[in-house]
Amino acid sequence: MEFLSFPLSSALLIILLFMLVKKAIQNKNSKLPPGPRKLPVIGSLHHLIGDGLPHHALRNLAKKHGPLMHLQLGENSTLVVSSSKMARAIMSTHDLMFANRTVQFATDILLYGGKGIGLAPYGDYWRQIRKICVLELLSAKRVQSFQTVREEEISNLIRSISAESSKVNFSEMITSLTNDIIARAAFGEKCKDKHAFLSLIEEGIQLAGGFDIAGLFPSLKLLHVITGKKRQLERVHNELDRILVDIIKENKEKRRASKLNEDKYEENLVDVLVRVQENTQLEVPLANDNLKAVILDIFVAGSETSSTTIEWAMSEMLKNPKVMKKAQAEVRRVFSGNKKINETEIQELSYLKLVLKETLRLHAPAPLLIPRECRESCEIDGYEIPKKTMVMVNAWAIGRDPENWSNGDRFEPERFDGISVDYKGTNFEYIPFGAGRRICPGMLFGMANVEVPLARLLYHFDWELPNGIKPEELDMDETFGTTVRRKNHLYLIPTVVHELERSTTKE
């Protein structure tokens, strides 16, 4: 028996040696970018465990292996970009080659298979839906049309804060504010399911955030069932879908009635989508699921990024009292004597704009942006990038790169004074909203929902930390999800400086 087992064990040993030699030869001949050591099955995942947040861990790995780094995250061949030079190569020089998005397990279920603007594959449909977003949904004119919505919702918040006699949960209040602004912009003033919808959006964001084990091994369908994630995602999706079906139906009925009665009304975002859907000249007809996907994109991207940016801006100003004092002095000088603050004057707040630029540099809402996907095999900087490789651009690391930023980890708004660096995608050392064809189309809408609330909160209130916490003691810990938020909610004590004029409140 032992004799018979010898040839078998020898054969197995030979096969194993052959596979190892073959693997070694493949690795030797491979022109993949450098990266850390990979293990069977899990690939490079062990390098991301126990090293803090993903964007931090990836920056640390890039310091060892370079700004163009290859990882194997489970089944996903992954390219990590950590310098402005490599970001330019991916999002400008070879932008078309990397114009696809990676649709993950969770977003595939929640967002109708990636039919929205954020995840749709590059092609005729994506070009059409982006054009609709840029020219119709999120144009400067459309953003301006929601000025009254912003004014009323911010006034409601200011009134609520003024009524508080002690500390407030600033984080929760800002999240509620941005949700309410976007809900009114999307659905109009009356939406019976608004609170249920917003609660489901929050649950969906929590489920989709961060690294997901089932998403790292997409071929192992059993994992999706074992973890229970698929069932949870499908439940949230189905409940959101039910609400969106009713909203779209109501808007279509309103549109038909207005045509019959020749009534005119101010369009909300769903109205715009319904009107565009009726256009028979569209190159790619829009089904209701396309409309739903775009609506969800606006909520998931718009609310999270705006509230996160306000929260970090306030945190940084509290930690840097000189910045807070200077920003408040500017706001109160510009708005001095005004009975009603209007958005035109926001453009005069040059220092506040520097504060927000610096906030976005240090706290890009999505630090790894939305992953791209290589459409065809190509060569970058002498390395071969296989087709279907997922690309993560570490905007957080690039925004702190000492090659581009002196004292990169410090909050210094003045660094932007007198320079033309902006977040519109042409300065690759500063890409909080991405760049190239897939740059965020909602920047105008998002920044309007940041600048106006922050300016008014600085105008109406003085802010201090509770419980005798000193500025230098304020924790700035992060938590990683769809966006990177504060790990702990920001609690503050407001003191009314300028009372709210009755004309700006909405009863």
Swiss-Prot record:
One Gene Ontology term, aspect cellular component: membrane
Residues that coordinate or bind heme: 440
Single GO molecular function: oxidoreductase activity, acting on paired donors, with incorporation or reduction of molecular oxygen
Record-linked Gene3D superfamilies: Cytochrome P450 (1.10.630.10)
Pfam family, one: p450
InterPro entries attached to this UniProt entry: CYP450_71D, Cyt_P450, Cyt_P450_CS, Cyt_P450_E_grp-I, Cyt_P450_sf
TM spans (from-to): 1-21
Superkingdom in the source lineage: Eukaryota
Subcellular location: Membrane
CC cofactor: heme
UniProt enzyme class: oxidoreductase
Entry keyword set: Heme, Iron, Membrane, Metal-binding, Monooxygenase, Oxidoreductase, Transmembrane, Transmembrane helix
Tissue: Rhizome-specific expression.
UniProt function note: Cytochrome P450 involved in the biosynthesis of etoposide, a chemotherapeutic compound of the topoisomerase inhibitor family. Catalyzes the conversion of deoxypodophyllotoxin to desmethyl-deoxypodophyllotoxin.
Protein name in the entry: Desmethyl-deoxy-podophyllotoxin synthase
Organism listed in the record: Sinopodophyllum hexandrum (Himalayan may apple)
